Amino acid sequence: MGGNALSQLQSVRVDGVIDYPNDAWRFVADRRRPNELRLAAYRGDSLISAEGFTGTTAWSSTPGSAVCALSSRQGSSIQRDAEFFSPLLSGAPDGATLELVGSTRVDDAEAYDIHVTRGDGFQSDYLVDATSYLLLRKREVRAPRAGEAPIPIETAYYDYRPVAGVLYPFVTVEREQADGKLISVTVLKRVEPNSVDAAAMAPGCAAKS
């Protein structure tokens, strides 16, 4: 993965499945640089909801309803999810600060622990492989799902594959940091580079399958 590949990647369409212990749904996520997101959720072939970030405003919608603009507090997690690259690659956006805390072991790998504090005060720890520089873990305090209380969560990244010369993790596992209890497993089925135009990012519940 090089800087040239990163600069040429302008958008991605991701098709995947999120499995929870008692639930599962398919999603299609459209992303465009620098920070636009449209995420549609499905049960089977039925669209159940959509949400996203236009670059300035977070929004949500369900089939048959009007688009709802979210407050900065309500939409903060969506806005973070909309970042095309992590703060480690995007040059500390929006006043974020990065601090090298030290190093630790992740499985059998030596990893750098980089603490990120965003402009809004939200904090995360990124554990990066000291040899490959791939992201291995992310730790932060947030809600597992909408409407739930924030807890310490560790996200693990696996199965990196090249997408237009950029390595993407195709498997993501979230666990409670306190006891390792499984929260969710996300598996990407398809990642299409540079396939999303501006029209695809329109807020609302038009299906994008």
Task: Provide a role label for each language-model segment.
Residues 3-66, 97-100:
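N-terminal mature ectodomain segment of secretory-pathway/periplasmic proteins
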Residues 23, 63-65, 86-91, 120-124:
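Short acidic/polar alpha-helix capping motifs at helix-coil junctions
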Residues 28-31, 49-55, 68-76, 128, ...:
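Short amphipathic beta-strand/extended segments with alternating polar/hydrophobic composition
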Residues 44-47, 107-205:
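Gly/Pro-enriched, hydrophobic low-complexity segments
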Residues 59-86:
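Acidic/charged, solvent-exposed loop-and-adjacent secondary-structure segments enriched in E/D, K/R, S/T
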Residues 77-115, 135-137:
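Short, conserved active-site entrance elements at the starts or edges of catalytic domains
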Residues 208-209:
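Short, solvent-exposed mixed-charge patches
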